[in-house]
Amino acid sequence: MKIGMILDAPFPTDPRVSNEASALINAGHEVFLFCISFKKDFKRNDILNSIKVKRYYCSKLLYKFSALAYTFPFYKYFMSRKISHFVKENEIEHLHIHDIQIASSVYHANKTNIPTTLDLHENRPEIMKFYKHVNSNLGKILISPQKWKIAEEKYIKLSDNVIVVTKAAKDEISKRINIESKKITVYPNTVKKQFYKNHDLNNSIINRFKSKFVLLYLGNTSKRRGLDMVINSIVTLKNLIPNLMLVVVGSSSYDDSLKSLVIKNKVKDFVSFEGWKNETEFPSYLSIANIGISPLTSNIHHDTTYANKIFQYMSFGCPLICSDVLAQKEIIEEYKVGELFKTENSNDFSKTVLELYKNSEKLKTYSLNCKIAIENHLNNEIVSQQIVSMYAK
């Protein structure tokens, strides 16, 4: 089958897209990828890992209108012409839409009613409520998360298949929209085997932290990720775990606030902000981590999605300490890979860290369970078979 994936972003950037495409190609399908370039000088036709990449120009100014995709129709009309050209030129037989932002453009272009799959990378209507630009004075006037939710429900109903990140997301959509659960396939953003089996290590990173008891945080550091609560807990933990070090690998516009909190709490010697790093550096940090943390705050989005970091932690046998938001709770309890603490509760977080620090046998058990869960159940080569089966129906 000729599958046309639609991504309104440059490529390659998103591992979810490339992982799904690779699985479908290995199953015998032909995958064409519509994507955009912000540069006028670009390679229009490309082949990357057998994915037939077709790039189309989109200025950064016009791309900003994607935030208004369900307020004004400019972006929809502009992108739909390009998508229509892509569909005809490549004789696409099935359209695979990567997230709700571009969905209206695809359906406007789909004049011949080609079968569609809507791939929801996250609960966009809920998470956008926390975006800085949405909460600006102008954003509050122009951008309505409620309109995005209405659009999401509309295109879920119109699509032949829907893909979500977690079982919790599947359950939430099934109840909210009243559609059959068999229409929805779960595909989490987990790791490929090569991530944890074929990698290089940076000795300078390892040497800096090898004598420390490392709490590792990977990923975006925005307020809703809960790092301010963790930093507050360091005030107590540093007196109980002398070689403690919180290592933060990631960044966001909230970093200045986090760094100010570190100074205010006088814990500068116990926190290392590493900044944003390429994924190729992650194995070095994971190899020196004693515990991987995911202290997400509670909201509908976090209840229905997995942070990529939890699978990255697990693949290196790094025990987890996670806030008890629903999706994380399911992973911890099903695979016995770590401990939960009450969301946004620094005392409970501190207590949980200290208990694991004092119990080396439990840490070893969780570490082994992490590796078993990834190798036998949760690596991408296994979970991607759900998408292959969906297309085989």
What are the language-model segments listed below?
Residues 1-41, 45-52, 90, 161, ...:
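N-terminal subdomain of nucleotide-sugar transferases
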Residues 14-15, 225, 274, 280-285, ...:
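Nucleotide-sugar-dependent
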Residues 77-85, 104, 108, 124-126, ...:
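Membrane-proximal helix-turn-helix segments that form the acceptor-binding/catalytic region
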Residues 168, 190:
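Carbohydrate-associated surface elements
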Residues 249, 256-283:
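Nucleotide-activated donor-binding/catalytic signature segment of Leloir-type glycosyltransferases, i.e.
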Residues 334-335, 339-346, 355-361:
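Conserved acidic donor-binding segment of nucleotide-sugar-dependent glycosyltransferases
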Residues 348-351, 355, 362-377, 386-389:
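A short, well-ordered alpha-helix in the C-terminal region of glycosyltransferases
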